[in-house]
Amino acid sequence: MSNRQYFKAEALKHRHTVLRKLLILMPVICVALAAFLTHVFFAVDGYNWWYMGMYPGFVALVCGTICEKEKKMKNRAILALPCDMGRVWDAKVLYGILMSGAAMLLLVLLVLAVAFILEHVLNVTFIIRPSLFSQLEAGVLLWLSFCWQIPWCLLLSQMLGRTVMLLVHFVLYDVMAIFCPYLFFICYFRGRSEPE
């Protein structure tokens, strides 16, 4: 079997799950909240809310749902198949990356469309107005910077279960978001105080 067939099997397995609903629902909720709550900072806040809260949750839920299918049967169905387990894992990771990329693309398109409506139809003046290129670039960079979390969350979900993985993922993400600026601050002064 080729890698394409493994990927098709993974996509077919998740065809009637909650993933496609989440793929549409989470970006729509994020854009709607940003549009209603912060009119003049809409484009910036749409991305900020997405990468600080909604996108990590989306990635964790996608990975938990991907692993949940086999975990229900204790991996007996997939272990009995005459297939390469490495390719099965690669197909899961690739499917998770594709789902996260589709969600990011939908968010970028929604932010662009709603920003156009707010600016040209409702005459809202944005305080910060990112260009089209910078918004597309932000979407690509956000997607690429989150791709490493998909194998990590799949591994945690496989080992610990979906609920524990969600808790560990959110706690680690929030702790790193809080302490990361201070770590750079400490490293900056430590490097500057050394004699030359």
Give the residues covered by each predicted segment.
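Secretory targeting signals
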Residues: 27-65, 94-162
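Residue-level recognition of transmembrane alpha-helices
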Residues: 24-27, 92-93, 169-170
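Aromatic- and glycine-rich beta-strand/loop motifs that create alpha-glucan
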Residues: 1-24
